[in-house]
């Protein structure tokens, strides 16, 4: 049954809608999955994934392909790279995450502070000159595609921003939720509404997603902090769902997509924890990220296919380097196994090969792994 979302409206004063009954099955699956997951329900889990993985993914959604190793190096020593724009977008998110971990109230003043952190040294002169005390003071055009034939979208008119942002804060801070999954749904409705308003000229998407993370932290819905990872793996669907919700005022499909994508990421996290338990020492961030990417692969897993996936999400590397840096360490630790070589070669001396997760070493609860191919 479709019902009105209370507290938020369009710029034409019409309602947004959602079909909660349609969402109940996936919500129930998530609650069942999380029932026995003690580690994922801790603040330390959130802090761990926010350290570098979420920084990478939140920027990756916007089309930036920073390698996880480089992100960690910049976080440790922000003078280690000369590219000022790259350094700023990484350090800004890292500092923004530190800010929301303080659990301060999500308010107009605190959001202003967060936005200053996230946008530092990233805005154009025009953007800076046309910013009001809190929000943009001019129209903004939103391009979801490089195709010039597709007309840009627009944020709401500047004179309406204040009213809609006040509704946004009231909606987020009006606490009626009973479960962590309810808080996740609310955070993603707010995520959409923020993008719909588009209160700034730039950095709206990163701010929307970071503020949704803020709501999750504030309400101790810690497992869901990884939702950006799901978006990062399905960016085209993400932007299509935003446009569909804008055109129909119905958020059901958008929220259903985000519930399913975060369920996949939680399953991967469960598998990752089981893998970690088989090792004598903790895996590196690079190894963890590689395993998570492997779990995202559909169909046959080969060196060439993994290279293609890696180069879609990172600064490009040669297939030989990817084999040596990403896959060989996992082969040595018996986390993945080489099944067979293929007819193709990746250079004059190396053959492409099929690999798989070493399931013999994993004691997985099959009831918890329903969406991920092992």
How should these model regions be labeled?
Residues 1-201, 207-374:
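FIC/Doc superfamily catalytic core
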